[in-house]
């Protein structure tokens, strides 16, 4: 939802559209689109910087301001919609040689006795869908433009989101899934001086 505040990268402040917890909160609350549904979300390393640097939980603050944005947890959460089990995980570390590798390895660690139908993993700023080990798996894209930092690291942001239509039987088994990737226009790199 936000890029966070990286005190260990002094140039980071010059790459932001707005600066500080309050401005970031206002930006999300005012700019995140409104639509008829709810957005369930978790945090991650970017949003965790507010907690590390000042003890503030950006996810909780966003949910207090927008009742359609439901914050579940800082890093990992399980959600049930009807009988469909959804597992969200932010992820961590660097990118791998192939787009699916980190997601595949993570899915292999999930408990097999738990009903998880859909796995959604973030962090890597790439988008992809695959069916693996009986689970519909999504590598979700980024909600931010490419930054000078990501460019210097050789990371290409895929600014996007998935819209997912599913059909389930009475037991909650998915028999049809249609993921649609919406790609957003990226803006020009920002570096303020």
Question: Model-predicted segments: where are they?
Answer:
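Core catalytic region of metal-dependent phosphoesterases/phosphodiesterases
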Residues: 1-71
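Short glycine/proline-enriched coil/turn segments at helix->beta-strand junctions
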Residues: 33-38, 84, 133-134
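Residues that act as N-cap/strand-start positions at coil-to-secondary-structure junctions
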Residues: 71-75, 158
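Short acidic-hydrophobic surface loop/beta-edge motif
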Residues: 75-82, 130-132
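Conserved beta-sheet core of the metallophosphoesterase superfamily
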Residues: 85-87, 92-179
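Short, solvent-exposed aromatic-acidic interface loops
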Residues: 176-189
């Amino acid at each position: 939802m936000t890029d966070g505040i990286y005190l260990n990268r002094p140039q980071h402040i010059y790459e932001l559209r707005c600066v500080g917890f309050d401005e970031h909160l206002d930006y999300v609350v005012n700019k995140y689109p409104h639509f008829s549904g709810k957005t369930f979300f978790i945090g991650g390393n970017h949003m965790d910087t507010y907690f590390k640097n000042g003890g503030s939980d950006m996810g909780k603050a966003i949910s207090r301001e927008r009742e359609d944005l439901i914050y579940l947890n800082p890093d990992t959460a399980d959600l049930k919609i009807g009988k469909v089990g959804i597992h969200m995980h932010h992820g961590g570390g660097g990118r791998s040689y192939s787009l699916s590798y980190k997601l595949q390895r993570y899915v292999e660690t999930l408990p097999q006795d738990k009903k998880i139908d859909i796995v959604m993993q973030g962090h890597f700023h790439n988008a992809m869908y695959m069916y693996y080990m009986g689970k519909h798996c999504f590598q979700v894209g980024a909600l931010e433009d490419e930054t000078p930092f990501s460019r210097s690291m050789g990371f290409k942001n895929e600014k996007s989101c998935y819209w997912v239509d599913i059909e389930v039987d009475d037991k909650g088994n998915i028999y049809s899934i249609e993921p649609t990737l919406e790609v957003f226009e990226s803006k020009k790199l920002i570096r303020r001086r």
